[in-house]
Amino acid sequence: GYPRKTVDVFTFTN
């Protein structure tokens, strides 16, 4: 996803 939350950053890189 997008760097909206802290955990969402992991999905953005993945």
From Swiss-Prot:
One of its GO terms (cellular component) is extracellular region. Keywords: Cell wall, Secreted. It is found in: Secreted, Cell wall. This is 29 kDa cell wall protein. It comes from Nicotiana tabacum (Common tobacco). The lineage of its organism: Eukaryota, Viridiplantae, Streptophyta, Embryophyta, Tracheophyta.
